[in-house]
């Protein structure tokens, strides 16, 4: 459970912003969105494979030198 303690004199808006940031860091919102509807195992595998390929492409893109240097 994520808890935020209000500091003395802290506006509620700032505390809400801190709470939202803390919730995003835990990954709770993403998990809740993924659990709202049933996802077939084949669809889940396809989604995970597509995400893994995107991560690989991103990693390769980061390792390449800029065009100006070679």
Curated annotation (Swiss-Prot):
Q: Does the keyword field hold Ribonucleoprotein? A: yes
**GO MF assignments:** structural constituent of ribosome
**From which residue to which does the signal peptide run?**
none
The keyword Protease is assigned to this record: no
Biological processes annotated in GO: translation
GO terms for cellular component:
ribonucleoprotein complex; ribosome
Superkingdom in the source lineage: Bacteria
Q: Which UniProt keywords apply?
A: Ribonucleoprotein, Ribosomal protein
Pfam families hit by this protein = Ribosomal_S21
Family listed: Belongs to the bacterial ribosomal protein bS21 family.
Stored NCBIfam families: S21p
Descriptive protein name: Small ribosomal subunit protein bS21A
Species this chain originates from = Cupriavidus metallidurans (strain ATCC 43123 / DSM 2839 / NBRC 102507 / CH34)
- Gene name tied to this protein: rpsU1
């Amino acid at each position: 459970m994520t808890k935020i303690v209000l500091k003395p004199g802290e506006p509620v808006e700032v505390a809400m912003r801190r709470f939202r940031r803390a919730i995003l860091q835990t990954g709770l919102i993403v998990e809740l969105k993924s659990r709202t509807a049933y996802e077939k195992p084949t669809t889940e595998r396809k989604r995970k494979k597509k995400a893994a390929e995107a991560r690989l492409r991103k990693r390769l893109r980061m390792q390449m030198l800029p065009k100006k240097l070679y």
